[in-house]
Curated annotation (Swiss-Prot):
L-ornithine binds at N162, D219, S223, M224. It is an enzyme of class 2 (transferase). InterPro entries: Asp/Orn_carbamoyltranf_P-bd, Asp/Orn_carbamoylTrfase, Asp/Orn_carbamoylTrfase_sf, Asp_carbamoyltransf_Asp/Orn-bd, Orn/put_carbamltrans, OTCase_ArgI. Reversibly catalyzes the transfer of the carbamoyl group from carbamoyl phosphate (CP) to the N(epsilon) atom of ornithine (ORN) to produce L-citrulline. Its main location: cytoplasm. Carbamoyl phosphate binds at S53, T54, R55, T56, Q80, R104, H131, P132, C133, Q134, C259, L260, R287. Pathway: Amino-acid degradation; L-arginine degradation via ADI pathway; carbamoyl phosphate from L-arginine: step 2/2. The gene is arcB. The lineage of its organism: Bacteria, Pseudomonadati, Pseudomonadota, Gammaproteobacteria, Moraxellales. Its EC number is 2.1.3.3. It is found in: Cytoplasm. This is Ornithine carbamoyltransferase. PROSITE patterns: CARBAMOYLTRANSFERASE.
Length: 306
């Protein structure tokens, strides 16, 4: 049996994805009832951060500790993948001392190359092209609040970035319609649209995408590494803010999500996080539970391989 990794949502079957989402909610209930569950005592998670993140570090580190394991944090100062030592060599050495690895970096090819030479499961904590762990949390959150997302309509408002790419994959796997509203020149990459165009519809304005939506999602206008484009992007995205007026075009029970951190007054209105249908705080917490379910799945699959 081949070693299992989680670099994109498509590394799972739809059945496996649904199983992980169900398990995430089970683990959440166990924690809320103060039930101690430590199946991975002695297991060590390596966390390689070339892009910093509060939520990613806390959720993974807390998750493996709650499982009875431990985590090692490696910052850009500790390891620079591909700079000084080939990624392939780093993967061989690092994975020989750990049980599972999470990488948050820039180029998606970095996690692919690392995984190719790793002896243990590798999780993509975020790359420029994909953010699959966030999709686990988003899907879990929607299901907890509204039930199955199959057949529903999701509106993505803003940049055709890594989050948007992962939503495109999720639409294909989970059977929902995805309406993407982006300024010209900021649409998702053609290769993602070419493969999953059957479940995606593009719009050049936010209002048309929001009509009858069951879920509206957005992200920052300028992601990490795009700070020099901030002013240019503010101008391009000025008409793509998610606010109360836009939510009024959607279904009355439409949920709102944002992976955070959010910039009030830019991609969202000043009060959007307090909207009655905003579930961003549940969404943020569910990173912990969804990633615990993912780690449990990957570690157990690796034990089967052994």
């Amino acid at each position: 049996m081949a070693l299992r990794h989680f670099l994109t949502l498509r590394d799972l079957s739809t059945l496996e994805l649904n199983r992980i989402l169900e398990r995430a909610s089970e683990l959440k209930k166990m924690q809320q009832s103060n039930k101690v569950y430590q199946p991975f005592v002695g297991k060590v998670l390596g966390m390689i951060f070339e892009k910093s993140s509060t939520r990613t570090r806390i959720s993974f580190e807390a998750g493996i500790n709650q499982f009875g394991g431990s985590a090692i944090f490696l910052s850009p100062r500790d390891t620079q993948l591909g700079r000084g030592e080939p990624i392939e060599d780093s993967a061989r050495v690092i994975s020989s001392m750990l049980d599972i690895v999470m990488i948050r970096t820039f180029g998606h090819d970095i996690v692919e190359r690392f995984a190719s030479y790793s002896k243990v499961p590798v999780i993509n904590g975020l790359t420029d092209d994909h953010h699959p762990c966030q999709l686990l949390a988003d899907l879990q959150t929607y299901i907890e609040h509204r039930g199955s997302i199959e057949g529903k309509t999701v509106a993505w408002i803003g940049d055709g970035n890594n989050m948007c790419n992962s939503y495109i994959e999720a639409a294909h796997m989970m059977g929902f319609k995805l309406k993407i509203a982006s300024p010209k020149g900021y649409e998702p990459k053609p290769e993602f649209l070419a493969e999953f165009g059957h479940c995606v519809e593009l719009f050049d304005n936010a209002e048309d995408a929001a009509v009858n939506a069951d879920l509206i999602v957005t992200d920052v206008w300028a992601s990490m590494g795009q700070e020099e484009e901030q002013k240019l992007r503010e101008k391009a995205f000025a008409n793509f803010q998610v606010n109360e007026k836009l939510m009024g075009l959607a279904h009355p029970d439409c949920l709102f999500m944002h992976c955070l951190p959010a910039h009030r007054g830019e991609e969202i209105s000043e009060t959007m996080l307090d909207h009655k249908n905003a579930v961003v705080w549940d969404e943020a917490e569910n990173r912990l539970h969804a990633q615990k379910a993912l780690m449990e799945f990957l570690l157990n699959e690796n034990l089967k391989k052994a």
